[in-house]
């Protein structure tokens, strides 16, 4: 692995830590990290988290964006905040899916992206 790849991995790990801390700060529920580096070139990791209401979903997503910006990361975009049943925050190396529990159950992203790949499936925040 080249030095540039090491720096990129360290940066990606730092961004993931920022995201997980932000979700923990706002009491995100059932936080899961899915390592998709071997499955796609779109992103390194996906984080899936539930909110307890649409207001909570939106607040979680906004807090992730705010914390990332404060640490010097520029989000590529955020989608879904109008209905706030599923808000996607694209931080390039980390994509965050903040979902209402019923939407999360229906789409089952953890199962979809962990088939044939490595799923960290870690509880990184308390419920």
Where are the regions a protein language model picked out?
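Long, contiguous binding/interaction regions
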Residues: 1-38, 52-59, 71, 80, ...
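Glycine/charge-rich, flexible interdomain linkers and switch-proximal surface loops
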Residues: 33-42, 76-93
């Amino acid at each position: 692995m080249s030095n540039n790849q090491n720096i990129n991995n360290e940066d990606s790990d730092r961004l993931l830590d920022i995201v997980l801390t932000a979700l923990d700060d706002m009491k995100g529920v059932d936080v899961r990290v899915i390592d998709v580096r071997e499955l796609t070139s779109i992103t390194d990791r996906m984080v899936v988290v539930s909110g307890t209401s649409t207001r909570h979903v939106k607040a979680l997503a906004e807090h992730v964006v705010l914390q990332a910006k404060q640490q010097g990361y520029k989000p590529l975009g955020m989608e879904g905040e109008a209905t706030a049943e599923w808000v996607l925050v694209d931080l390039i190396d980390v994509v965050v899916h903040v979902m209402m529990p019923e939407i999360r159950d229906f789409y089952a992203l953890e199962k979809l992206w962990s088939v044939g790949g490595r799923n960290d499936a870690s509880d990184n925040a308390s419920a």
